[in-house]
Amino acid sequence: MNALTPHFPVMLDEVLSALEPHADGLYVDGTFGNGGYSRGLLERADCRVIAIDRDPAARVRGAALEAEFPGRFTLLSGCFGDMEQLLAAEGISRIDGVALDLGVSSMQLDQAERGFSFQKDGPLDMRMGQQGQTAADLVNTLDEDRLADILYHYGEERKSRWVAHAIVERRAETPFSRTADLATVIRGVVRKSRDGIDPATRSFQALRIVVNDELGELERALGASERLLRAGGRLVVVAFHSLEDRIVKAFVRQRCGESEGVSRHLPQASNAGAGNPPPSFQAVSRRAVKPLDAETRVNPRSRSARLRAVERTEFPAWTVSPGGQR
């Protein structure tokens, strides 16, 4: 099996259809991972692709694509939230499309030594890059209230207080260093759900999000995409959990000039004339697109995926950040 294709890129056909790559276009694959989206773009059209990934392991896969598509593919090391600065360093200020596949990759989950998996024992790390604090740093140093808040807000763990208390009690005896130890403590507090989801799932998600500042990266990437895309360029985002999708949905609705309706049964009203700037995007599809059953059977990871796509208008980018104020 080719080193670039041991895992399936989620909703690849839908992503390519939404982006509509064309010859001589310049596209950004903000989450290179295993290179599925980049390869799809390069094979679909005679375009150029700039990929971004903070994971050092991506460099080998990127080098293979650079050799296969000389002059058309470049991998930049860094966070996709910094795409504006990364592209500026390459002399690029305008692009035709951005694809973002959010969250942790299957490869990272499969490698126990990366510390993302609660099913395989490994060091309690969870960093997508090599910089910053690890998950072990968080669970061994944060006070109980702060730890509970993280588990609740970023993992939507309803028993966050109980989990945090159990973690603090256990670390008083022996600090955490392995994923299996943390998962065991969590499973001792949280029952397995009826749908079979592992009790450690939500807590591990919360820690991973905080370690890698995933939601902050997403907000920065959305704003950067808005500023970089030329009129007619498209932004396509595939999210895997509700926290990500809420941010993307709110950004899309705001930038498309849609207000939050007072009732889901009433039509959406435009807020473009209510003191807001004109819409910088228009929706490609009215609702989030879900993967086909055929894909979820082959790739169960895709079941929770939600794709949202928008097209850049001719109006200027907003000065308000996706998650902040003007």
From Swiss-Prot:
**Which InterPro entries does UniProt cross-reference here?**
RsmH, SAM-dep_MeTrfase_MraW_recog, SAM-dependent_MTases_sf
Q: Which organism is it from?
A: Rhodospirillum rubrum (strain ATCC 11170 / ATH 1.1.1 / DSM 467 / LMG 4362 / NCIMB 8255 / S1)
Pfam families to which the protein is assigned, alphabetical: Methyltransf_5 (PF01795)
Its domain of life reads: Bacteria
Query: What is the name of this protein?
Result: Ribosomal RNA small subunit methyltransferase H
Q: What is its EC number?
A: 2.1.1.199
Its annotated function is as follows: Specifically methylates the N4 position of cytidine in position 1402 (C1402) of 16S rRNA.
The UniProt similarity line reads:
Belongs to the methyltransferase superfamily. RsmH family.
Q: What class of enzyme is it?
A: transferase
Q: Identify the keywords attached in UniProt to this record, alphabetized.
A: Cytoplasm, Methyltransferase, rRNA processing, S-adenosyl-L-methionine, Transferase
